[in-house]
Every structure is written in C-alpha cells, then in structure tokens.
C-alpha cells in the first residue's frame, strides 16, 4: 500500500487515476464524445490531477525527461515530505476582527448557548457576567436553590480555560490522533510509528498504561474511535480494513472489518461508531461512505457520496439515524440512515459555502448543528434546517475545482485570505484565525457539561490550539508550544483539560494555572518562596462540580 507509480510523460503511457471516475465527475462523457475530443479530455484530466495533487511532474536527468508521479490522495499522502509539517510555521493566519454574527442573532443556537451558560436574560455589560458578582449573588441566596445552576457552573468554568502546559509525552514520529473516551477516563493516542497508546486519566492522572501495535498500517493510523461501551477502540489507515481491538485484558484481540473496496489503493480517513456499537461508518478516498455491521460481520453499504475523497464522517446524535459527511468537493452532506440505498445514493440535504475541501466534521450532538473545518482556512457552523440551494452547491463545487494550490506542501495563496462569502452560502457563522495545512486538521465543540458548548476549538498548522467563542466568533485562547502542525485536539468531557496531538511528535496536556497570587490566599511558606524566586504559576483551586454518573 505504500508505493507510488511513475511513468514517462513522453511515452504516452499515463495510467489513469484509479479514483478518477469519482474525482472527475465533471469530466465524464459518453464514449462517442471521448472519441471525438480525446486530446481535449486528456489535457483536462491531466490538468485536474495536477491541480488536485493526484500527480506531480518531476524532472529527471534532462530537460526532456519528465515523469508523472502519482500521489495517493489529495488528503493524506503516503510518504513524508522534507518540511515534515513545519511549513505552516511561516504562515500567520489572518484573524477576523469583525465576524459577521447576523445569522446567529436570530437562530435558536444563540438562545441554547446562553441558556446552557446561564447568560439568558442577562445584559451585555461585563459586570453582569463577572465571576465576583455571581459569587455575591450566591452568598445573598439569590441563586436557584442556594447554588449555581448547571448553566452558571459552565459560566464559572469559562473563566478557567486551559492556559498552561502541564504534561508532555514525546514520540519518535508524528502524532496523528488523540481523543478522550466518552467518560473521560481514558485518552487514546495514535502515532505514525504504528503504535496506539492508552492513558489512564482517572483521579487527575495522565498515566500511560498500555501500548498496542496497530496492524496492517499503510503510512500511518489515520483515525481512531472508541466503542460506546468503552471496552474497545477502532482505527483506520491505508488499508482495506478497519480494525477493532480490545482495551482491557492481557492480550490484544484484533478483529479486521473487511470493507471490500473496489479501489486498489484504499484508505479510510474518518470513522464513527453508532451509539449501540453495531454499525461502523467510514469515509474513504474513493468518494464512498461505508457501513459495516458488526453483528452480521459484513459490509452492508457502499454509498457513492462525494466527487472526491470523503475526509470526514459523524453521527448527528445518539440515535445514530442522521449522519454527516464532508469531502474534497467542499460539500457537507446530510444522510438519513433509514433511507440510504446503494442503488439510490441521495442525501436528504447538503450544506455548501466552503471554497475548498472539508477536513473534519463535528456534531453538536443535538441532530441539528455541526461544524466543519476546511482547507479554505475557515470553520463554518451549520444548521441542518437550512439546507443549501442548488446555486450554493454549484458555487462551492466551482470554487473547489478552481483551487490551483496544494495545501499539503504549498503556502496559502493570498486570495484565500480574503473574507469572501459565496453565493448561496447557508452557514450560520464563519470562524477565521487558524491555519489548515499539511493534513486533515480537526475542530470540535467544547464539552456540554463543563462549558455549555460555548466554544469551538481547533488544531492549527502553526502549532497552536485555537479556541473560538461560538457566538461572537472571536478567539478567546491560543495555546502555543508545538513546533509543527497540531492535527488533533480533544477537550476532557468534564474537566478543563485539552490535549493536543502534533506532527512534532508530541502529545501535550493543557490545564488552567493561576498566573497571579493574592497575598491573602498564600501561606507563609508560599510568600517566602515567591519573595525569593519571583512569582510563578500555581495550580488553580479546583472548582468541584458534580459529573453525571
């Protein structure tokens, strides 16, 4: 799975891309038209493949000796480049100083977030939102039942966002994936060294307790997921199989789920598991969605979903009936699992507005809202009650096909810095200020329990973790320490902790630390230490809120 094909450009023996039937949907013609316009079609095919990064022209020993090098995918290529993910350090993503919030003002998500963070009905003054004022109200017995509501607890926690590096684990190769389990007790990390590492996160710890060698890995593990019961995890790679492995027990029990693809070079870029653990959803480089039934132990669906790589899949909520997919055609599609058929692959709707391929999708978990990260250097917030028109879909497709740069090894063109809204863009909000280069960088909603999902956070090609306020669109926090792009980020479901996974070969845990002391809060030994060595950050006293069982 790790090879690339090369052929002489002058020999006329160029092999067509094996995924071209799906990638070049706009180039399909009848056999009669192909015979009449063969030369034109070949030129269009070559231009398309060069533009999308599927092939590259490489000069050999002489000026006339040109070779076509076939790359595996526009999204995750199966070899390491010289820049090693550090090109993005030279790119300073433009920050949107005045985000357009007009669509959000009249959408229900604004009310939902304000309710979840205890801000509904409050004014806009800083005093009304201040932490001291909330404590004063509680002391006076003005809070509901004498204590903070769940929304007020989330508002309190918003004052203690992670800001300090508390733990680092270093690997010999790039870290690709890193996620917390649903209960926050385990963190799973996947690295290019084909090793999956599991960390015990109970009782405030972050201790590695198991390392598992992944099987049938081409280039790297590309995505991971936990099963709902928390006893197994799944991973995908450049392989025909999605693997499932046990977490507990002495041995490692691996089971291969055969997707039986039509492509010879095949990769699953994104995976998701249904809430009952029965079905596994995958998005692949052949433009298809795959559904594998674990009870029947077979692939049950192969849906032609996108015109290019499917980079992202997600279930909309716990029912697992509605699902989302996003691809390099810049379109996010919404599917109903109950009506999905191979002979009639029609989504229930589409969301258009991105100008380049989608790298990741995260659902808010309410079967209505989702966010998508894109190579156009933006995150967009969507409401599935606002599907895009045909005009919007055509505008996004056209913008994506007109991109003439490759995000894997080229700098972002200046035209992509412009704040431009495509005709028919149905998104509620656009977030700018992070970089999406080199790889499929992830973005996610912050947890509901501790933050009321009032934030969106993303990895960044400049080695940062960027946290946005969902309603204002402004950046509220940047975590900076990595030396290469941050591909994955994961926020603990109940605690103010964020873990970043980077191509610099490190995993980093971020927590809140108080930067200033108040004399009344310090012991005599603390005062002596500060006077002798200067101020140093100390752990913030934990704000103890109960978590659901």
Swiss-Prot record:
Keywords: Phosphoprotein, Repeat, Ubl conjugation pathway, WD repeat. Gene3D superfamilies: YVTN repeat-like/Quinoprotein amine dehydrogenase. Transmembrane segments: none annotated. Residues 1-24 have a biased composition (Low complexity). This is DDB1- and CUL4-associated factor 11. It comes from Rattus norvegicus (Rat). Residues 1-40, 80-100 are annotated as: Disordered. One of its GO terms (cellular component) is nucleoplasm. InterPro entries: DCAF, DCAF11/LEC14B, G-protein_beta_WD-40_rep, WD40/YVTN_repeat-like_dom_sf, WD40_repeat_dom_sf, WD40_rpt.
């Amino acid at each position: 799975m790790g090879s690339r094909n090369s052929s002489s450009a002058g020999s006329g023996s160029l092999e067509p891309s094996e995924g071209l039937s799906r990638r070049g949907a706009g180039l399909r013609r009848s056999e009669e038209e192909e015979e009449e316009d063969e030369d034109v079609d070949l030129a269009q095919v070559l231009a398309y493949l060069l533009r999308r990064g599927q092939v590259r022209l490489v000069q050999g020993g002489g000026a006339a000796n040109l070779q076509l090098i076939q790359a595996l995918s526009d999204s995750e290529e199966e070899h390491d480049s010289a820049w090693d993910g550090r090109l993005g350090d030279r790119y300073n993503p433009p920050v949107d100083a005045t985000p357009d919030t007009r669509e959000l003002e009249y959408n229900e998500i604004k009310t939902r977030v304000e309710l979840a963070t205890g801000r509904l009905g409050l004014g806009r003054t800083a005093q009304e939102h201040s932490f001291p004022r909330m404590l004063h109200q509680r002391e006076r017995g003005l809070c509901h039942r004498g204590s903070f509501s769940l929304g007020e607890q989330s508002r309190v926690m918003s004052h203690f966002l992670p800001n300090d590096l508390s733990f680092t684990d270093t690997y010999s190769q790039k870290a690709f994936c890193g996620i917390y389990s649903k209960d926050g007790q385990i963190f799973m990390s996947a690295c290019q060294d084909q090793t999956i590492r599991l960390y015990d996160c109970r009782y405030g710890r972050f201790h590695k307790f198991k390392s598992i060698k992944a099987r049938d890995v081409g280039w790297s593990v590309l995505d991971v997921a936990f099963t709902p019961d928390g006893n197994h995890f799944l991973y995908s790679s450049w392989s025909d199989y999605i693997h499932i492995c046990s977490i507990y027990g002495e041995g490692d029990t691996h089971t291969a789920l055969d997707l039986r693809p039509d492509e010879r070079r095949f990769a699953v870029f994104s995976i998701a598991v249904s809430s009952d653990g029965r079905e596994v959803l995958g998005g692949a480089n052949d433009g298809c969605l795959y559904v594998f039934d674990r009870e029947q132990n077979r692939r049950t669906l192969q849906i032609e979903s996108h015109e290019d790589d499917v980079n992202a899949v997600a279930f909309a909520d716990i029912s697992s009936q509605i699902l989302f997919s996003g691809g390099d055609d810049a379109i996010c599609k919404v599917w109903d699992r109950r009506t999905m058929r191979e002979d009639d692959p029609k989504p229930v709707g589409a969301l258009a507005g991105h100008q380049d391929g989608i790298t990741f999708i995260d659902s808010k978990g309410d079967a209505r809202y989702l966010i998508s990260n894109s190579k156009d250097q933006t995150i967009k917030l969507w409401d599935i009650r606002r599907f895009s028109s045909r005009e919007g879909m055509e505008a996004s497709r056209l913008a994506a096909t007109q991109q003439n740069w490759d995000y894997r090894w080229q700098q972002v063109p200046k035209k992509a810095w412009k704040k431009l809204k495509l005709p028919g863009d149905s998104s509620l909000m656009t977030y700018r200020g992070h970089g999406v280069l080199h790889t499929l960088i992830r973005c996610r909603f912050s947890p509901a329990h501790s933050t009321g999902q009032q934030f969106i956070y993303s990895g960044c090609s400049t080695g940062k973790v960027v946290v946005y306020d969902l309603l204002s669109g402004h950046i509220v926090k940047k975590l900076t320490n990595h030396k290469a792009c941050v591909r994955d980020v994961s926020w603990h479901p109940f605690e103010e902790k964020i873990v970043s996974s980077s191509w610099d070969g490190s995993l980093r845990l971020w927590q809140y630390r108080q930067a200033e002391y108040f004399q009344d809060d310090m012991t005599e030994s603390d005062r002596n230490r500060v006077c002798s060595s200067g101020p140093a950050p100390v752990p913030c006293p934990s704000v103890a809120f109960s978590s659901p069982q």
